[in-house]
Each structure stands twice: as C-alpha cells, then as structure tokens.
Curated annotation (Swiss-Prot):
UniProt binding sites for L-glutamate: R41
Function of the protein: Catalyzes the reversible conversion of 3-phosphohydroxypyruvate to phosphoserine and of 3-hydroxy-2-oxo-4-phosphonooxybutanoate to phosphohydroxythreonine.
Record's GO cellular component terms: cytoplasm
Family: Belongs to the class-V pyridoxal-phosphate-dependent aminotransferase family. SerC subfamily.
List of residues binding pyridoxal 5'-phosphate: A75, S76, W99, T147, D166, Q189, N231, T232
Protein name as it appears in the record: Phosphoserine aminotransferase
InterPro entries documented for this protein: Aminotrans_V_dom, Aminotrans_V_PyrdxlP_BS, Pser_aminoTfrase, PyrdxlP-dep_Trfase, PyrdxlP-dep_Trfase_major, PyrdxlP-dep_Trfase_small
Entry EC no(s): 2.6.1.52
Organism expressing this protein natively: Parabacteroides distasonis (strain ATCC 8503 / DSM 20701 / CIP 104284 / JCM 5825 / NCTC 11152)
Recorded catalytic activity of this chain's protein: O-phospho-L-serine + 2-oxoglutarate = 3-phosphooxypyruvate + L-glutamate; 4-(phosphooxy)-L-threonine + 2-oxoglutarate = (R)-3-hydroxy-2-oxo-4-phosphooxybutanoate + L-glutamate
Length: 355
C-alpha cells in the first residue's frame, strides 16, 4: 500500500528529488564515487552549491545586495545568529508559537526585546493584529508559519521597520518581497531538503553595525565571504535541495506552488468544516496552508484514538497532532500530491459514515 506522508518535518520530498538524490548516492556526476564520499571542494560539488544558491535567487526574485548562504545548526541556531549580528539596542518580536518564543528567549541574551504582541493567551490559535512597533527597533522578527499550532502569516507585514523572518515551514510556498527583509532564514526539512542544512537570505549592508565581537561561525559575513564553504557543508542535503529547486522551476515556480498549496489546503479545510466529527483549532483567517490542525468535536472526543488507528490502517502517516495541541495535524508542504489530500478526506468521510 502506498503511504501518504503528512509528517511535519522531516517531511515529504518530491519523487524527482528522491530519485535523483538516490542515484547520486550510487554515482555522483559520473565520477564513479558516491555523493556521500566526495570532496566538498571538488569542482562537481562546488557547481552544485553554486547552482542551488543561484536557483534560490531566481525562484524568489532576490534583488541585488542580498546573498544566499547555506549553514548548519537549523533554525534554532538562527535564533541566536540573528540578534548576534543585528541587535544593537532593541528589537521587536511577535510571539505566535513555540518557535517564536524560542527566538525571543535567545534574543534577550543580546539586548532589549519588545514583544509587541502574543497569542499565547489563547494557546496560539490566532495571529495578533493591530500591534505597534517602536520606531527605534533595530528590526521586527516574526515566524511566518507555526507548524505546531497551524497558524500562518501569508503576507509580508506592512511596517516601516526592517523585517527578519523564520520561514522554515512555508518558504517557497508564496511570493515574497525580499526587499523588505534584512534576513530570511529557514531550516530545510519542510520545503527544501532533508534535515542538515539551513538557508539564509541576507541583506549584506545590514551586517557589520553591531558593537560586539561575533564568533567566526556565528557571523553571517563569514559564510557569505566563503560561499557557504567556510567549514565542510552538508553535501547530501544541499544536493537534495538543488533537486527540489529544479523541480520547483520545472513545475512552474513559486506561483505554481502557491496555487497547488492553496487548492490542497482548501480541500482539507472544507472537509473539516463539513464533517460532523471534526473541527479546526485556529481562527479561520489565520489558518495555515502548510499545517492543517484539527480535533474531534467535543461530543466525539472518545473516537480520537479510533480514528488515528483507522487512518493509519488506510495508509495515512504522520497525522498525530503535536502533544501541546493534541488531535491531528496534516502537513501539506509543496511536494504533497493532491491525491494524498483526497485520500485523507475520503478516509474522514468513510469514518464519519461509520459513526
């Protein structure tokens, strides 16, 4: 039976990415060597690294003055790197979930942090609006998509301050006005590659203005200067990222990804809203296109374990909700085929008939 992969991350990758990466593990670029054993300094891998970064610039329409870098450490290291490199006196942060809260905690090590608004009062089930950002903030940091709670900000905030964003789980799912941002960062394991590489898009002239020494590995300038090769890069994830980027381009680019993602999410949300057994967990206007969170209606709560087993038997993988929310979560990243979403919906309908 074909499995339908709804894991929140590491998550589904396109067949194109998996097949090409698997072939390269056997024999990379006709070298007679595995991708797992080549030198990262070989001209063949340098070409991969360069092409991947160039494709990111092309797909996201990155303007002049920005550089794309690959690093290790995940988004969690970026929580530290951003304030290390940008925070002089004060930064503003929006608290919309666990990962935003973790970023705030790290930033407080480097200066004053103004949490302009938080949705913690309602277990992060909405995106705050109408907040004020101090004029003297060095930057405004937000998390565009909240994988645990299923909320998302799908538009670039219209504020005068420079933006910094954790786009780990929705980058490449919509057009972005990069010119509004100082830094965009993203762990790869949702919409790009296997875990192990982190992407950052950095406005070069935003760097070099803080009054503190920055450790070499935590300085964005280090990685920009060395073309993401300051230390040995994660070769396999970068190669897989290139395959994903090629697939995005082949599919029609970011606009095509957005159209498909919106359609997939609508199919599932429509069923959640129709089905007597289920309900969504977040404000409708803030529903994530990437991570659809839902629970059993109160009168059917006792069926939760039964549905989980039923869905698993039907080939659904990874729909258990995060422990802090409970219920279910279906992650619909860019590689998610419509057929898998339709299979989950059919499963929900059939379970409803039985109850």
């Amino acid at each position: 039976m074909k499995k339908h992969n709804f894991y929140a991350g590491p998550s589904i990758l396109s067949e194109y990415t998996i097949k090409n990466t698997a072939a390269a593990v056997e024999n990379f670029a006709g070298m007679g060597l595995s991708l797992l054993e080549i030198s990262h300094r070989s001209k063949e891998f340098v070409a991969v690294n360069d092409e991947a970064r160039a494709l990111i610039k092309e797909l996201l329409d990155v303007p002049a003055g920005y550089e794309v870098v690959f690093m290790g450490g995940g988004a969690s290291m970026q929580f530290c790197m951003v304030p290390y490199n940008l925070l002089n006196k004060k930064a503003s942060y929006l608290d919309t979930g666990t990962w935003a809260s973790n970023a705030i905690k790290e930033a407080k090590l480097f200066g004053e942090v103004d949490v302009v608004a938080s949705s913690k009062d309602k277990n992060y089930t909405y995106i705050p609006k109408g907040y004020a950002i101090a004029d003297d903030s060095d930057y405004f940091h937000f998390t565009s998509n909240n994988t645990i709670y299923g909320t998302e900000m799908r538009k670039d905030p219209d504020v005068k301050q420079r933006l910094v964003c954790d786009m780990s789980s929705d980058i490449f799912s919509r057009p972005i006005d990069i010119s509004k941002y100082d830094i965009i960062y993203a762990g790869a394991q949702k919409n790009l590659a296997p875990a192990g590489v982190t992407l950052a898009i950095v406005r070069v002239d935003a760097l070099g203005h803080v009054d503190r020494p920055i450790p070499t590995m935590l300085n964005y300038a280090t990685h920009i200067k060395k073309d993401s090769m300051f230390n040995t890069p994660p070769v396999l994830p970068i190669y897989a990222a290139l395959q994903t980027l090629k697939w995005y381009k082949e599919q029609g680019g970011i606009a095509a990804m957005e159209k498909k993602d919106l359609e997939n999410a609508a199919i599932l949300y429509d069923e959640i809203d129709r089905n007597k057994l289920f309900r969504g967990t977040v404000a409708e206007e803030d529903r994530s296109i990437m991570n659809v969170c839902f629970v059993m209606n109160d009168e059917y709560k006792e069926l939760e374990d039964e549905f989980s087993k039923y869905a698993t038997a039907a080939g659904m993988v990874g729909i258990k909700g995060h422990r802090s929310v409970g219920g279910f979560r279906a992650s619909l990243y860019n590689a998610m085929p419509k057929s898998s979403v339709e299979a989950l919906v059919a499963c929900m309908k059939e379970f409803e008939k039985q109850h």
